Amino acid sequence: MPKTETYPRLLADIGGTNARFGLEVAPRQIECIEVLPCKDFESLSDAVRFYLSKCKESLKLHPIYGSFAVATPIMGDFVQMTNNHWTFSIETTRQCLDLKKLLVINDFVAQAYAISAMQENDLAQIGGIKCEINAPKAILGPGTGLGVSTLIQNSDGSLKVLPGEGGHVSFAPFDDLEILVWQYARSKFNHVSAERFLSGSGLVLIYEALSKRKGLEKVAKLSKAELTPQIISERALNGDYPICRLTLDTFCSMLGTLAADVALTLGARGGVYLCGGIIPRFIDYFKTSPFRARFETKGRMGAFLASIPVHVVLKKTPGLDGAGIALENYLLHDKI
């Protein structure tokens, strides 16, 4: 089949809260982007059909190739989302949507592919020196959950992406304050993973733990209705709620620890890339937050980490971009 006959391609980036859809009408050209709340639809297929009905006027041809990035491990045909109610069979969904091919990949595999094609203005560098071209790149990012993956560029220019579930590693507190936060979380959960703190709901959990800290009993606090990640962040940046600022500082410190752990584990001299929608909301604060200092606080490996640049991804739809690149690789090479 001529390459032009594979367009439009149906792309999706499906997280725990929202599903983003788009139509790739030409290489790296995505149109009709829509964001739909997952909770509004009984199933993935229902959401896709609703999306396609909204794009009916723009569709000259029905898509026959699709690529979906989903925030959950892919282990065979049956897919169960980690942070929402959707479950689906890849093959049944392909048939239901009348697709010739449906590629389903982990969402942070898509993020890694997207990073391979990003330009300098898509990123904000936080410290470090320069990326080594063929060294591993670590990709992680807090959102509804916490994703982690690895991107390796071989000497011939080909790419290898290693998916992982690093967000579910056990959280290791760094100091007495983080021990207090961990103890609060441990009273609620059997396993306290990094994702418990480094996610949208994690900001709320950190705030709740800190609000019980001795000496903060009389500090101005948020009402129950205000306990959302967005409001905690806003109050922290406004400076009128010290406990919110401490929450955000603690969040960034914890992220620095995890990012350093991942960088050391992978030898990520190709850089660390922070994805997701949380950090770009407060990027100016993040640049001067405790993140970078904590990232480099690793004893004898401090100098090694000091040279590694950290980049915050600013691009709006990297999940869709990466899903498209993965599908292109599959159609060209019969593998991603």
From Swiss-Prot:
Pfam families: Glucokinase
Binding residues for ATP: A12, D13, I14, G15, G16, T17
Superkingdom assignment: Bacteria
Keywords: ATP-binding, Cytoplasm, Glycolysis, Kinase, Nucleotide-binding, Transferase
GO cellular component, one term: cytosol
InterPro entries linked: ATPase_NBD, Bacterial_glucokinase, Glucokinase
Top-level EC class as recorded in UniProt: transferase
Chemical reaction(s) catalysed: D-glucose + ATP = D-glucose 6-phosphate + ADP + H(+)
Subcellular locations according to the entry: Cytoplasm
Keyword Kinase: yes
Signal peptide, first to last residue: none
Annotated GO biological process: glycolytic process
EC numbers for this chain: 2.7.1.2
Protein name (database record): Glucokinase
Gene name per UniProt: glk
